Amino acid sequence: VAGAAEGFDNDEGEAFTVNYDIRLALKTSFTGKDMLTSVLRAGNFGPSIWDEGLTFVETAMSSGGSVKIGRLFYTFPVGENLTVTAGPVVRTDDAGMYAGYATFYPSDLLLDFFTYGGAWATNNLASTGAGLGGVYKFGDSGFSVSGNYVAWDGSSTGIGRDETGSTSSWQLFYEGEVFDGNFLAQAGYAYAQNVGLTIGTNKAGAAAGDNRHGYSLAAAWAPADAGLIPSISGGWSMSDPDDSDEDIHGWYVGLEWSDVFVEGNSFGTAIGQAPKVEDDYNKMWEIFYKFAVTDNITVTPTYFIIDEYSGDLSSDYVQGAYVKTTFTF
């Protein structure tokens, strides 16, 4: 990722930076139906604007010049309809932990806020830990449910204790065909314990406290064939802190067109409101065009605007651009 932004109070915040994130996924199956997944990861995004706040990009990772274990979990079936995942380094949205994202936006993960599929309050992606989860599919109905528990510091404070930083997420998910297109929908609930807010304005972070209930609704539709009609994705989440009377809300709507000008390329844009309290203000917008240079190389120029970056009506207006290049092997 190479880019810069303006609107910050310090020169470092507006510096042009070049950052990398590299991942090596090792997947082993013992029965043909199970999967042991381990991911080695390294990156140099921090400290930079791409590694913090509302300008955080989905690929941002800082490893301090070393290679770290990004994932280590085992997924296996139980009967015909249930899939279970367990491991010491797992996240709430990993395979067998989460039924699915009700979104078709974006095809290339960019600003982190827009990658949650509207479910930022029920799918905490800030960290990994020791976890257990399962996904149950109701036959061919298109419906599935999932539930999981992740203890961020399970190796030190333990699992299931009052001091443990943890999240527990539950989801009802649907996938089917509607109006000659593909339709996704989800409703989610989560409880976070001793965990700060993953993303949001300054006031939202202060109001969130450490313990809170989260709720989310999201839906998305995509045409069966590429054309003038884009995919449409939208979602809303609310967080209800235990120690505050202020609820936290956020929403987004994203549009994406496939095979724009050239097959394999896509164009997309999204607008939304980062998690905020009632007397707060924030608006976010991004636009991108993804070039498929080859089957294994994509280049995605992106431009974004964040109105009220801090969300405290301080008139901080941030805009920026970057180019994300992805190589897959």
Spans of features found by a protein language model:
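Outer-membrane beta-barrel and related beta-rich outer-membrane complex signature
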Residues: S48-E52, G96-F104, L197-I199
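Beta-barrel outer-membrane channel/assembly domains of diderm bacteria
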Residues: V1-G87, D112-F114, N123-S155, D162-S166, ...
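Glycine-centered loop/turn motifs
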Residues: G264-S266
